[in-house]
């Protein structure tokens, strides 16, 4: 079994669509092995998104991710990373395929409802950023 990391972003929490996202995750065959609701500080968001530090959108991204609560998740299934990326859909909801979370619930490129690890290396950094082993069942 493979594990991946996911975040339900502040825009989705604000719009009360967390339950819809969780339903789509479970319908997609994922097992939720870790879940917590947290509010990132700007510093924590900067640490999490450090790989984008030199990108022009870094400041706006960190401000957005720290503006309200998020739901951090660890998902498990065979091919979890690729399957989660497929279920999320394209970054821009306008370009996402029907049946994906971003097509159904995304508002814009920034307010696109969810985040997901893009590789095993990313997952191995992102999961322990939010969870210790005792929190994963």
UniProtKB/Swiss-Prot annotation:
Coiled coil: none annotated. Pfam families: NDK (PF00334). It is found in: Cytoplasm. ATP binds at residues 9, 57, 85, 91, 102, 112. Keywords: ATP-binding, Cytoplasm, Kinase, Magnesium, Metal-binding, Nucleotide metabolism, Nucleotide-binding, Phosphoprotein, Transferase. It catalyses: a 2'-deoxyribonucleoside 5'-diphosphate + ATP = a 2'-deoxyribonucleoside 5'-triphosphate + ADP; a ribonucleoside 5'-diphosphate + ATP = a ribonucleoside 5'-triphosphate + ADP. This is Nucleoside diphosphate kinase. It comes from Geobacter sp. (strain M21).
């Amino acid at each position: 079994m493979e594990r991946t990391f996911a975040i339900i972003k502040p825009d989705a929490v604000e719009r009360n669509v967390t339950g819809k996202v969780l339903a789509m995750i479970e319908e997609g065959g994922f097992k939720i092995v870790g879940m917590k609701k947290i509010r990132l500080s700007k510093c924590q968001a900067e640490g999490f998104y450090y790989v984008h530090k030199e990108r022009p959108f870094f400041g706006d991204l960190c401000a957005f991710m720290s503006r309200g609560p998020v739901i951090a998740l660890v998902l498990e299934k065979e091919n979890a990373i690729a399957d989660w990326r497929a279920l999320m859909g394209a970054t821009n909801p306008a370009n996402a395929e029907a049946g994906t979370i971003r097509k159904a619930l995304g508002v814009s490129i920034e307010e696109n409802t969810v985040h997901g690890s893009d590789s095993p290396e990313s997952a191995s950094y992102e999961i322990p950023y939010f969870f210790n082993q005792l929190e994963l069942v």
